């Protein structure tokens, strides 16, 4: 069956990854040590997308855990699902990358990368028909960003025809851990544009907003944020892991979502999101789910899609959902919001259904959107990058690891190109021969 090999790099990647494995182990009826004690055959049917079967009814994740310092790994190992992972699949250095992209990409990370690739190769050889790789990492740090992108390009060389999906945590405007985030993120985006097939953009600030506004948590922890991310990751891969009426896999998702190869940065959302106390006051229905996933407040990237237009989007519904109802709701959304969908891609919403809901819910839905408003995210990082780069602030940390200023300039211009490509398609109309008219103006009045 169509297996996926999962990599998690850096502290952020490992923590999101751990939450993801916890979520899908629960969905497949595995306990903390990987022993199956589920209730339904459906849980077993496609277990091998993410798990290898070992002896004694034990299942082992196809996960490779990478970090340049041992701390995070120890935390994962000591966590509730620490016994799940194969001990050989922990690959870690001792030095740490110190939030320095150059260390992760060129010096420290480059020394460790062959070791990681050996493990990846071994996992890939254990697959019948490998579908692709998914990697969780953040773009603001050193290991996840620098070494993560190095791994992506190396895996790309070795498995050119396999899908590469990344779940990338973008630096957010208000929640910043390090000063050099804009540098690290710009250098990473420069790599992702070239080497990834689909990048799901997640951003801490948007996750905080969801926790505070929708889930009514007063001081959300990283655990709460990671739980949200793992819900989306589980949703995106549902169709691979359970039989459904209308299935989708990484490649189908990419074919439907990526109109131009460089524009593969998606916004994601999840529904139902309700605060713990309000569960009993709401019925989860298809219209309710559809309204929630198209609500800007539920997007896990801090950019408002009302400032742009959707090129394409995909909605994945789980649970006992009627096909017709989904179609009607989606058509309804498109008719009401025609201004937010480009008219030169008709039927640009793809739907997928899976009959098995996540634990504890009757139905749920996951949203993936390719919207031109994602450019706000890149613009924001780009402005911060330019401000520092103009003064050459902090550059010596990077040049000291053997980087060249040229690389920074290239990365900056590549990201600016990406922004202008998004802008160009946002303004494009069906009849390109006509004069370009400014479509942004009428949207202001609607708010």
From Swiss-Prot:
GO terms for molecular function: GTP binding; GTPase activity; metal ion binding; structural constituent of cytoskeleton. Its cofactor is Mg(2+). Transmembrane segments: none annotated. Residues 432-447 have a biased composition (Acidic residues). The keyword DNA-binding does not apply. Keywords: Cytoplasm, Cytoskeleton, GTP-binding, Magnesium, Metal-binding, Microtubule, Nucleotide-binding. This is Tubulin beta chain. The lineage of its organism: Eukaryota, Fungi, Dikarya, Ascomycota, Pezizomycotina.
């Amino acid at each position: 069956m169509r297996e996926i090999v999962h990599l998690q790099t850096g502290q952020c990647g490992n923590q999101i990854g751990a939450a993801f494995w916890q979520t899908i182990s629960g969905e497949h009826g595995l306990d903390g040590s990987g022993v199956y004690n589920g209730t339904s055959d459906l849980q077993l049917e496609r277990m091998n997308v993410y798990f290898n079967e070992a002896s004694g009814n034990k299942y082992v994740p196809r996960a490779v855990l990478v970090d340049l310092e041992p701390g995070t790994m120890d935390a994962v190992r000591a966590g509730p699902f620490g016994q799940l992972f194969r001990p050989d699949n922990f690959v870690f250095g001792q030095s740490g990358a110190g939030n320095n992209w150059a260390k992760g990409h060129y010096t420290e990370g480059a020394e460790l990368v062959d070791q990681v690739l050996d493990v990846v190769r071994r996992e890939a050889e254990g697959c019948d028909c490998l579908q692709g790789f998914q990697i969780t990492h953040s773009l603001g740090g050193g290991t996840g960003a620098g070494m993560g992108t190095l791994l992506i390009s190396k895996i790309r060389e070795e498995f050119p025809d396999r899908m590469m999906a990344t779940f990338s945590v973008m630096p957010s405007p208000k929640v910043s851990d390090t000063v050099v985030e804009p540098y690290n993120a710009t250098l990473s985006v420069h790599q992702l544009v070239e080497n990834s097939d689909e990048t799901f953009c997640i951003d801490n600030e948007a996750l905080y907003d969801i926790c505070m506004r929708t889930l009514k948590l007063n001081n959300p922890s990283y655990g709460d944020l990671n739980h949200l991310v793992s819900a989306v990751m589980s949703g995106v891969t549902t169709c691979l892991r359970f039989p459904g009426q209308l299935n989708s896999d990484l490649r189908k998702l990419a074919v439907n979502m990526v109109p131009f190869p460089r524009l593969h940065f998606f916004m994601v959302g999840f529904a139902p999101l309700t605060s713990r106390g309000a569960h009993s006051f709401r019925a989860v229905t298809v219209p309710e789910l559809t309204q929630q996933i198209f609500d800007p407040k539920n997007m896990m990237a801090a950019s408002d899609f009302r400032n742009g237009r959707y090129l394409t989007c995909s909605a994945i519904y789980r649970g006992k959902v009627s096909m017709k109802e989904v179609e009607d709701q989606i058509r309804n959304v498109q008719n009401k919001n025609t201004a937010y969908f480009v008219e030169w891609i008709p039927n640009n919403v793809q739907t997928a259904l899976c009959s098995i809901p996540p634990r504890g819910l009757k139905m749920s839905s996951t949203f993936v959107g390719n919207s031109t408003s994602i450019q706000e995210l890149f613009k924001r990082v780009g402005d911060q990058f330019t401000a520092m780069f103009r003064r050459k602030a902090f550059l010596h940390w990077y040049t000291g690891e053997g980087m060249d200023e040229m690389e920074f300039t290239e990365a900056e211009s590549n990201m600016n190109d990406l922004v202008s490509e998004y802008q160009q398609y946002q303004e494009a109309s069906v009849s390109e021969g006509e004069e370009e008219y400014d479509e942004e103006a009428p949207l202001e009045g609607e708010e």
